[in-house]
Amino acid sequence: MSVQPHHHQLGDWPLACGHTIADARISYLQIGDANPDGSNLILVPSSYGAQVEDLAWLANAVFDPGRWCIVIAGQFGNGASSSPSHGAMGLAEQGWVVRHRDNVAAQKRLLQERFGAERLAMVYGWSMGAQQAYQWAVDEPGWTERICCVCGTARTSPHNRLFLLSLRQALTADRHWNGSGFNAPPEQGLRTYALIYASWAASQPFFRQIDEAVEEHVERHWLPHYQRHDPRDLIAMLDTWLAHDVAGGGDLQAALGRIRARTAVVAGSHDLYFPPDDLRADADAIPGATFHVIHSELGHRAGNPHSSPIEQGHLRRITAELLAHPNSS
């Protein structure tokens, strides 16, 4: 069993935007052993800003690694897979926009070449990971037995776009932005970015119960997470999120209606990014999908409860129910 992150080389990788990543690579982490027929593979695409090791808490807390082989895959732009910080790609200003269809294709290549896989027991994702799970079900129905989409939607909503654009503007308004990158670390831009991010990621009840000033809380607990990233990578992932639409600009209801995977859609009661009504609408469009709400003051982070046993228990129950039933398609 591998417990360290690895990279899988993809060669020159064409993107839907028309550019090609030279010598592309995808980061991944394997927890648990694959069955000889690959029937126990669970793919976990990464969320915004996450390294694959950040999601390793799912083993044992949600999935039994003695039964399931959990493959956590890093999306392009996360700093470990091919990213602007490597010089591998540019930003939207130069016409570079990675779409989740590109991420799904790279993950499929990883699974084929590293694991000999032809099918996945489940694609499980939170936030941008949920977006990729939806994309898997739309693009690769023959591969995707089940999807569990936690705190994420099948298309970026207009209101969610405003949040993302405010984050992008916080970074590119910094005095060190030069139109294609940064001449120096955008310290003020990152501080503004962290304040905006925190105000949306956690809920109003969450901030009412903290025992320090909110600006100090953000400085201590939020800002360091974003400072570990090259800001160009943060922007690249924002652009992927902004471009997200499993229907590619077409009929979303029709695209979701064609999903054959057994599906669970999981909302957070206080999620300000992806409110329950938005997730319920996606679930209602997918044949046979189940809809769940985790009642939690963690806000959007209720779907990534790495240190919150109550929320972990909800996710463990939902995924166990999903995995207990074969896909009838």
Q: Model segments located where?
A:
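Catalytic-loop region of hydrolases
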Residues: 1-44, 329
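N-terminal cap/lid subdomain of alpha/beta-hydrolase-fold enzymes
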Residues: 27-87
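Conserved acidic catalytic loop of the alpha/beta-hydrolase fold
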Residues: 90, 101-122
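Conserved hydrolase catalytic core segment
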Residues: 118-161
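Alpha/beta-hydrolase-fold enzymes
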Residues: 143-224
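Short beta-strand/loop motif that positions the catalytic acidic residue
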Residues: 259, 265-267
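Conserved alpha/beta-hydrolase "acid-adjacent" motif
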Residues: 272-278
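Catalytic active-site module of serine/aspartate enzymes centered on a nucleophile-bearing elbow/loop
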Residues: 280-281, 288-329
